[in-house]
Amino acid sequence: MATPHINAEMGDFADVVLMPGDPIRAKYIAETFLDDVVQVCDVRNMYGFTGTYKGRKISVMGHGMGIPSCSIYMTELIKDFGVKKVIRVGSCGAVNEGIKVRDVVIGMGACTDSKVNRIRFKDHDFAAIADYEMVRNAELAAQARGIDVKVGNLFSAELFYTPDPSMFDLMDKYGIVGVEMEAAGMYGVAAEYGAKALAICTVSDHIKTGEQTTSDERATTFDEMMLIALDSVLLGDK
């Protein structure tokens, strides 16, 4: 039955959901890559769709910006709609010179300045990591398409406009492959509810050089990331 934030019914969603932050990107993914698409929810214009990719039922739904928004949608999808795997397909910023705009990065783990996982883990450090098989399948899917990917730690920031830009130098030193706002929270939700999760991101801007993509590009391109995510789902079924 419908939840406060998702007006769908049990069975409307596939067991695997791709989740971009932007609901317009969710619509783009559904219309571009899926067949037999049905819109299944639209509360607060956070669109959700279900269709098939090469015959495999897959859903896609936006999650908004930041850990709180992402956690709400992901929790309801898992608890109330039977979703087993969530793949974030979003954008991130780069801090390392070896990572360029439009590169694809896979979040094997996620650091954060949020306290959300300490709240759920009785104030202890929780190692927020992706599901290993999902990481492996995403890397294999990328290799099969000849797409170079970077695998490593993301940093999930609470603030988009940080008051301490020197933190980016520390992230670079520690080998952070991308800065975004959700992965650490979604890995915590997955662990709490016994689901599996992975964040795949395309670098939309470089924090050090200032190079960036446009909002239109972020909403309607980044196709390599989508194909990696979709192909990885098929590999996970084997």
From Swiss-Prot:
The active site is at 205 (proton donor). One of its GO terms (molecular function) is purine-nucleoside phosphorylase activity. GO terms for biological process: purine nucleoside catabolic process. A purine D-ribonucleoside binds at residues 5, 180-182, 204-205. InterPro entries: DeoD-type, Nucleoside_phosphorylase_CS, Nucleoside_phosphorylase_d, Nucleoside_phosphorylase_sf. The record marks 218 as: Important for catalytic activity. Its EC number is 2.4.2.1. The keyword Glycosyltransferase applies. GO terms for cellular component: cytosol. It holds the Pfam family PNP_UDP_1. SUPFAM superfamilies: Purine and uridine phosphorylases. Keywords: Glycosyltransferase, Transferase. It catalyses: a purine D-ribonucleoside + phosphate = a purine nucleobase + alpha-D-ribose 1-phosphate; a purine 2'-deoxy-D-ribonucleoside + phosphate = a purine nucleobase + 2-deoxy-alpha-D-ribose 1-phosphate. Phosphate binds at residues 21, 25, 44, 88-91. Catalyzes the reversible phosphorolytic breakdown of the N-glycosidic bond in the beta-(deoxy)ribonucleoside molecules, with the formation of the corresponding free purine bases and pentose-1-phosphate. Homohexamer; trimer of homodimers. Belongs to the PNP/UDP phosphorylase family. This is Purine nucleoside phosphorylase DeoD-type 1. The lineage of its organism: Bacteria, Pseudomonadati, Pseudomonadota, Gammaproteobacteria, Vibrionales.
